Curated annotation (Swiss-Prot):
Functional note: Non-vital for development.
Organism: Drosophila virilis (Fruit fly)
Region 4 X approximate repeats, residue ranges: 85-496
Xref: PANTHER family: VESICLE PROTEIN SORTING-ASSOCIATED (PTHR11679)
Annotated membrane topology: Peripheral membrane protein
Keywords: Cytoplasm, Membrane, Repeat
GO terms under cellular component: cytoplasm; membrane
Keyword Membrane: yes
BP-aspect Gene Ontology terms: vesicle-mediated transport; wing disc dorsal/ventral pattern formation
Positions of Sequence repeats: 85-121, 203-245, 419-456, 460-496
Name of this chain's protein: Protein sly1 homolog
Domain of life: Eukaryota
Coiled coil segments of this chain: none
Keyword Ribonucleoprotein included in the entry's annotation: no
């Protein structure tokens, strides 16, 4: 069964095959073409189709729509962009300049009748009507970062951000446009999936606005016999992404949980995003050369190490890098040993030696050289990334922040008073201290004002900008007036208990001990088998019950149709039903598949928690799937900046 990302890839490959229904052509049969995209189209393509794959699909040149371009005759030009006025004006300019002989226009969102008429008039005026071969609405206006993780915007994502949704001076028409943008992308998502969902969401929230607009859009399309996009042939639709049962779309508002986006994480992918600003599966790490030029590292689905370890705790990743390096060195030494034992020195000698049956082992080893070289490239890349993360961990004491925040969120007693930690000049950066304080403020039930005042004074002495606290205070007061919401968002931590350990890490091919860093290994509510060595403690991870973040707890309740005061009050919208309504049916079967979407921005912490949760729920008889998405993807620094912007709109300077 195809995943969301695979279905989007297939849709774009079909577009690049000039919207032909035939199977994907080989490079030898591909029609050579030019790909012209706007920035949104570029953001959609870049995480899922590499430049090498574009070449194999016959794309000889890929350029920005608004860049300076020369005329290229006799080659199809495939446009992939939003039907905005700015983009359409540029396409009309291309018509007038006669840049191409063959035009294939593919719009990310449906183009309105008036705009298509204006485009046709421009083509008629330019005398190129016959040159326009196809005009398509593609319904792929979302960004697939993983098989089960998507966002709606990358560049200019502030248009759909938490700040944009919650700022005080947003006009009604601006909010309508923002919600329509989210709805259009979610509609495109379900067209790509080939399924019509049941919609659940909390009432009186931005999520409800999205839910009602989306239900209306789905219902209108379903009951339009001519334009129905969900009546595809089963063989074409691939039976839809999910099982025969309809999926549930759980729309949630970022306001339900402000602590998790600020949490110092310990899993590899979330750490890369938090510390190194991972974006569209690409991260830039400063090279160790004399120039120290940032080097791009592509973390895609073809990277076996990344696919295996992106959700692992960082110390586990470090040990895995060391093991991969040792495996590579053993393979390299084996080839050298075989060559030496047979008296082979150069590549030319290998060709002569292949006639001998005794060289079968050497032949196999030599044939594996390309795979070994790729393995070495990935080892070097992940060593570079891990070293950059390690430097941040040491400088900012991120391991200690992770452990302290886990204890706060799971209501455990801290080893040291928070005030002492905030006053420690060596304890992280001002931003880290502010994140820790906000998590403490959110998770604590009742806090004396004198204690808060002392904590705020410590933050100010550390150089923290306290603007965000005014907004967090207002947010918490609203949450406290909504008992059902407050109950649903009780924190239990990100699913970990921790045990200190020392471990080896690698840097440029050599291992070293993380001096001064207290490494943490995930402990799943069971005893960890410890074996004392001469200089470190080794720990074995044992999977067991996983504590869940608020989004995961709510997802579990909705999928299993558990009776709960808070989720029972959620809207229940079924676009396929002839009579619309929002009343919860009496008889409901548990959902096997869910799309969880966070209005106001998602993060890798919640994504990984959902991934871990669904792994725990899999059995031989039950196969459940969850797709997680957000209007944007923000790390803690970006989210803190949004909170500060909202706090700046409030007169009260600090939280109390």
């Amino acid at each position: 069964m195809l995943t969301l990302r695979e279905r989007q890839i297939n849709a774009i490959k079909q577009m690049l095959n000039l919207n032909s229904q035939q199977p994907k052509a080989m490079a030898a049969d591909a029609v050579w073409k030019i790909l012209i995209y706007d920035r949104v189209g570029q953001d959609i393509i870049s995480p899922i189709i590499s430049i090498k794959e574009l070449r194999e699909l016959g794309v000889t040149l890929h350029v920005q729509l608004h860049s300076d371009r020369d005329s290229i005759p006799d080659v199809p030009a495939v446009y992939f962009c939003l039907p905005t006025d700015e983009n359409l004006d540029r396409i009309q300019q291309d018509f007038s300049n006669g840049l191409y002989d063959i035009y294939h226009l593919n719009f990310l969102a449906p183009i309105t009748r008036s705009k298509i008429e204006n485009l046709a008039a421009a083509a008629l005026h330019a005398g190129c009507v016959a040159n326009i071969h196809r005009v398509y609405d593609q319904y792929v206006n979302f960004i697939s970062l993983e098989d089960d993780f998507f966002i709606l915007k990358h560049q200019q994502s502030d248009q759909l951000s938490y700040y944009a949704i919650n700022r005080a001076n947003t006009r009604d028409e601006e909010m309508e446009a923002l919600m329509d943008s989210i709805v259009d992308s979610l509609f495109a998502l379900f067209v790509t999936l080939g399924n019509v969902p049941i919609i659940r969401c909390p009432r009186n929230s931005a999520a409800e606005m999205v839910a009602r607009k989306l239900e209306k859009k789905l219902r209108e399309n379903l009951w339009d016999a001519r334009a129905n996009l969900f009546h595809m042939d089963a063989t074409q639709a691939g039976g839809g992404v999910f099982s025969f049962q309809r999926p549930v779309l759980l729309l949630l508002d970022r306001n339900m949980d402000l602590a998790t986006p600020l949490h110092h994480t310990w899993s590899y992918q979330a750490l890369v995003h938090d510390v190194l600003d991972l974006g569209l599966n690409l991260v830039y790490v400063e090279d160790e050369g004399a120039r120290k030029k940032p080097k791009a590292c592509d973390l895609d689905r073809n990277d076996r190490f990344w696919v295996t370890h992106k959700g692992s705790p960082f110390p586990t990743v470090a040990e895995a890098i060391q093991e991969e390096l040792e495996s590579y060195r053993n393979s390299e030494e084996e080839i050298k040993r075989l060559k030496t034992s047979m008296g082979i020195e150069g590549e030319s000698d290998i060709a002569f030696s292949l006639v001998n049956d005794t060289t079968a082992m050497l032949t196999s080893a030599v044939n594996s050289l390309p795979q070994l070289m790729e393995k070495k490239r990935l080892i070097d890349m992940h060593t570079k990334i891990a070293t950059a993360i390690l430097n941040c961990i040491k400088a900012r004491r991120l391991d200690s922040y992770f452990e302290i925040e886990e204890k706060i969120m799971s209501k455990q007693t801290l080893d040291k008073p928070l005030l002492e930690l905030l006053r420690d000049a060596e304890f992280g950066q001002p931003e880290d201290k502010l994140r820790l304080y906000i998590i403490y403020y959110i998770c604590a039930q009742q806090l004396p004002e004198p204690e808060l005042e002392r904590l705020r004074e410590a933050l100010q002495s550390a150089g923290c900008d306290l603007t965000a606290l005014a907004y967090v205070q207002r947010w918490k007061s609203i949450m406290n007036r909504s008992p059902s919401i407050s109950q649903a968002t009780q924190y239990e931590g990100g699913g970990t208990r921790t045990v200190s350990m020392f471990t080896k890490l690698v840097s440029q091919g050599s291992s070293f001990v993380m001096e001064g860093v207290k490494n943490l290994v995930v402990k799943r509510h069971v005893n960890i088998n410890l074996r004392l060595g001469s200089d470190r403690v080794k720990a074995k991870l044992i999977p067991n019950f996983l504590e869940n973040l608020p989004v995961t707890k709510i997802t579990e309740q909705v999928m299993e149709c558990r009776s709960n005061a808070e989720t029972d009050d959620y809207l229940y919208l079924a676009p396929k039903l002839l009579k619309g309504g929002d009343v919860l049916p009496k008889n409901r079967a548990p959902f096997q598949d869910a799309v969880v979407f966070m209005v106001g921005g998602g993060n890798y912490i919640e994504y990984q928690n959902l991934v871990d949760f669904i792994k725990q729920k899999q059995t031989s008889n039950v196969h459940r799937r969850i797709i997680y998405g957000g209007s944007t993807l923000t790390n803690a620094r970006q989210f803190l900046k949004e909170l500060s912007a909202l706090g700046g709109e409030i007169q009260t300077p600090t939280a109390s």
